[in-house]
């Protein structure tokens, strides 16, 4: 949830999976051509939060079909497991923290973003001093904190939703309703 002590460390852990610089483990799957696309991030609300990881199976042009959802899920879980096991370099942590601080500085230059920041602080009942000291809070997060939250939250407790394109049923037509259509006035 918003304001949870693990929220920022978890944001960094999720950035180790997917980030704008494409240095995450899911980004590597995309760059290596093992999946078509993928992403990871957090959604935080006042009383609960979610970690979302989405991946699109690789489309094989020659066979004109996608790779199986099972193989895509397996590759994705392996990428997540690397982070959960603490298999990441220290420089990535520092780069992600610096990028988060840079984005905060850019956000503080935009009036609309400042308004959104204040609004979020208000409805999540967060201390404004703590919200404005975001950069100090981010830089204080240690690698051990990130390993701890990654191990705690990136585990086997997940729901996998597989979405596939359905096939049209041939020969079935919808019957017309048994009432007269409404005629528009002229």
List the predicted regions and their residue ranges.
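PPIase-associated folding chaperone regions across multiple families
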Residues: 5-12, 30, 142-145
């Amino acid at each position: 949830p918003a304001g949870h002590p693990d929220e920022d460390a978890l944001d960094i852990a999720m950035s180790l999976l997917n980030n704008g610089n494409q240095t995450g483990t899911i980004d590597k799957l995309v760059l290596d051509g093992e999946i078509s696309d993928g992403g990871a991030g957090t959604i935080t609300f006042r009383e609960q939060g979610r970690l979302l990881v989405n991946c699109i199976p690789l489309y094989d042009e020659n066979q004109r079909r996608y790779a199986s959802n099972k193989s895509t899920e397996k590759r994705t879980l392996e990428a997540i497991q690397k982070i959960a096991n603490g298999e990441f370099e220290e420089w990535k942590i520092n780069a992600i923290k610096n990028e988060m601080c840079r984005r905060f500085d850019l956000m503080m230059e935009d009036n609309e973003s400042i308004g959104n920041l204040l609004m979020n602080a208000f409805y999540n009942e967060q201390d404004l001093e703590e919200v404005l000291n975001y950069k100090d809070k981010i830089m204080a997060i240690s690698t051990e904190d990130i390993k701890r939250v990654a191990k705690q939250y990136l585990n086997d407790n997940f729901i996998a939703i597989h979405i596939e394109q359905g096939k049209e049923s041939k020969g079935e037509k919808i019957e017309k309703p048994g009432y007269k259509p409404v005629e528009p006035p002229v």
